[in-house]
């Protein structure tokens, strides 16, 4: 059976693409970075999907070719890598596109480059000399956490660098999971990726409020004032709680979802496909509800984490977690009963080794149902009857670990036609050393000698709507107060709802004082009851935008983070809010801001909506040593898409496994 055009590349297809690239470069060293599905041009795919949804698809129907995007370095005799991209038709085993990426761009990092950094640090006399300035207690060893270099300063030579954040770990605990972040060291070695040499060791300041940006105030006993702060249960001095009873998710008749072709999901009138790639992680495609098209594609496009400590080299501290290393590359192997509960379907991914060979990533995505409280309810006080349904959701989830931080991403589908994109931030704060007894305006002291720097986490979700078809418009709805008027508003209670259709690509920001709402509508189809165009809506999350000065490198390379909503006209391959190449970038290139600058018409056409939101994270002590989840939800809801509440037919069955607690659980309290 031929794979669906949206199915991820199989291991066999990945290896075919690899072999085609190797054949194109005989007697040359090829260092592979990524091989994954190059999604078909939208026009081709829509033709195929039309046949599929109409039931007219046959073995002889035209199909888009299976294309593999291959990213790799070609290393010649001069040992200087040339970053190149090719597209391979795995069906014909031919290379159909090829380009050499400009030297102004850097390929996303690989874990092998991080391994090299650690190895070279410990072998470097320069690093060992810097380390000799500190007296570490007996039993402590140095740990190096590799990090992207960040945005190059304008005066720096445009070479590829990596840096390491240094910590110490207490080996006397005999536990490899002991929290080394509790013991930060003020050393940051920098490696030239080409020569693989440590070219310098930056020495950040450790002072407090009122001290200079570069003042060296540390003592040789650099971690003598730091404290143990462990999070693994076996190292918790008080142990874990003993009064927590099990809470099980039980589905005795199995799940309500159905999976076919290892990518097609059907559940409660929803129909969509799940895919995965090394850049975005899990992506959602061809979303329909009850036989009607809703979305063409949904993904987490980018996120950036800029830090607010101006002391060098922290001014460069800014990660693009999807562009720099790839959200999919950093995905967890999800664990049953921990990461996901209930009756679970796992989806595997196929990734690429340094030699280009395919390797399976098991359990990259989990799919499960969950109860999220009441769906709808009404009590008729006249009859005493209450009708209530539960709000069940289908969750598509993946989790990524990026050094110290974890991010949990979930696409949630509900029975009333709603879609929620949820992100959760957890993990461990990125911390630096601070002198004993001092505080800082650049962050918060969360433990002895440990400063958690102020920073932001800014996400961008890409929404490609297909509201009853591919041609849509975007409306901005606002609710405005109206002054009292003796004729039109004599009592002052009236407010006016204004709706404007965007004419050109552009951007705007959340406005909670106006309840500013984004509506993605089909202008050719009206709701028979309201007479408004059918659509889906969301209210932009009113979170703080990027705080860095607009002229700073931080801001110039993350222009997508400067506004809450962007609206662009669709172009094939235009998927990444921060641009295709973010590693060491100095400005955003070919990102959403450039797409807006084209000034395309966005009326009754193929539009894309980008929603930016996040957290300004000024750390608190309670975030240490591991951070409770911070939750953000972008709620995409039907707006005059249906003729009534689409979940009216959800059964109001009573859950027979629920029971009342006995008197031994609930006793009278004495105050």
From Swiss-Prot:
Region called N3, residue ranges: 107-211
Lineage: Eukaryota, Fungi, Dikarya, Ascomycota, Pezizomycotina
Keywords attached to this entry: Copper, Disulfide bond, Glycoprotein, Manganese, Metal-binding, Oxidoreductase, TPQ
EC numbers on record: 1.4.3.22
InterPro entries: Cu_Am_ox_TPQ-bd (IPR049948), Cu_amine_oxidase (IPR000269), Cu_amine_oxidase_C (IPR015798), Cu_amine_oxidase_C_sf (IPR036460), Cu_amine_oxidase_N-reg (IPR016182)
Highest rank taxon of the organism: Eukaryota
Protein name: Copper amine oxidase 1
Natural source organism: Aspergillus niger
Induction: By N-butylamine.
Molecular function per GO: copper ion binding; histamine oxidase activity; primary methylamine oxidase activity; quinone binding
Biological processes annotated in GO: amine metabolic process
